[in-house]
């Protein structure tokens, strides 16, 4: 594809890293929704245009810009009529499932998918090899015993945390830590996060060795006092 539409946000970093950002013409995310500098810069330079969210794409704009592929996340499966509309208009749709990967290295390996898609397989293989090499020493080390709370506070005051089977929790484990979780590890649920009351979070996280605030979802914090 030379003029793709990207609604699967998790793919942007891979696309940038393999040098294929110029193959994207349309974004399903607005400029202020990107935390990847290259994506923001492309939208500022108007080489990447916002063409509506995944569930309400501007098909006319995409057709006028010769869109030749829509890269969707599994969210599009909740709106099959949108996928059908794009395909009826001659825009192929591919649904990537990287969000279903619970293993951090499994998620990383999706760079090979994008390498194959954008004819950059060598770059993708090199990136995967170099990044996995960085983890080799860490994976051979014994667990540190340190506990980690990974979260953000929602607009209504709840606390969003990762579930025990989520890739972020597993990434913390791979790094030698123990992610504080609040769910039943045997629970069958496709969601990777859950929202709990602040009191519940505080009770279990107050003695954590480290707290990591997920500012990619919410606005950044500059001090601990902002949590109070």
State each model region's role.
Residues 75-88, 213-227:
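A ligand-binding cleft/hinge motif common to bilobed small-molecule-binding domains
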Residues 47, 60, 64-73, 77-158, ...:
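Extracytoplasmic substrate-binding proteins
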Residues 2, 12-16, 60-64, 84, ...:
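Solvent-exposed, polar/charged alpha-helical surfaces in well-ordered, non-transmembrane soluble domains
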Residues 31-35, 100-104, 218-220:
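Short gly/pro/ser/thr-enriched loop/turn and capping motifs at secondary-structure boundaries
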Residues 140-225:
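Flexible, glycine-rich surface segments
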Residues 1-65, 69-76:
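A short, structured surface patch at a secondary-structure boundary
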Residues 20, 89-90, 175-176:
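Short, structured coil segments at secondary-structure junctions
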Residues 7-8, 17, 52-56, 75-79, ...:
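Solvent-exposed, acidic/flexible segments
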